[in-house]
Amino acid sequence: MTEPIRVLVVDDQELFRAGVEVIVEAQEGMSVAGTAGDGMNAVRLVDEVNPDVVLMDLRMPEMDGVEATRQIFLPQRVARRVKPVRVLVLTTFNLDDKAATAIRYGASGFLLKDVTPLMLCDAIRSVHTGNAVLAPTDLSALLDAQFRAPTPVPDSYLSLTQKERAVFAAVARGLSNTEIAAEIFASESTVKTHVGAILRKLALRDRVQIVVFAYEHGLAP
């Protein structure tokens, strides 16, 4: 039997936390691992209960969601985990600078707080499998503003094969594995293998980090 996706709900509004908790618990294959009302307690609970997905509000007292995300993905914390944790940030603004910063720190995407319960649960499942949750156009607009002066391309990128670079560019454009497979005339399993190699060589966590890497180093289309 497949283990349920364990979700940590982080928001300073108790009513919102309670509502999300009800939605998650009602879904087959999901459970609530805990709740927190600020970033400091969120970081502590991630270490204690090791959730699969964190729903992270951006604007909270004590410690906001951006700083909490940064601390969650500190190398020393990541090294202690037996499985990866994904962070999905929640915001009331479509193009939010704080969301872009959280994505740079390791978040897998962002959702507006007025999404439907179905969209929320689909997003949880998606980030749990390592996908990004946001439209490529939204991500492009966010990252364009963040990386106006790209940094030099690191040696790790130069280690990618020609085919891996083609897949890298396609992921940076927001294409799915199915779309990439059609573009490079390969099977989806081959594309998955290439994506895995890219993540390993560049020391990245997931596809959204490939997009961030592309913008950070001036490799975005």
Task: Give the ranges of each region predicted by the language model.
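Conserved acidic segment of CheY-like receiver
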Residues: E3-V24, L160
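Recognition helix of helix-turn-helix DNA-binding domains
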Residues: G174-Q209
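Active-site residues of response regulator receiver
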Residues: D11, D57, T91
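Acidic catalytic/metal-coordinating carboxylates
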Residues: D38-N41, D64-R70
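Receiver (REC) domain active-site loop signature in two-component systems and cognate sites
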Residues: M60
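Short, flexible helix-to-coil linker/hinge segments that flank and couple to helix-turn-helix
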Residues: A99-R104, S108-G109, K113-Q162, A166, ...
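Short hydrophobic/Thr-rich beta-strand motif most characteristic of the beta2 strand and flanking loop
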Residues: G29-G37, L45, L204
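Active-site beta3 strand of CheY-like receiver
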Residues: V49-L55
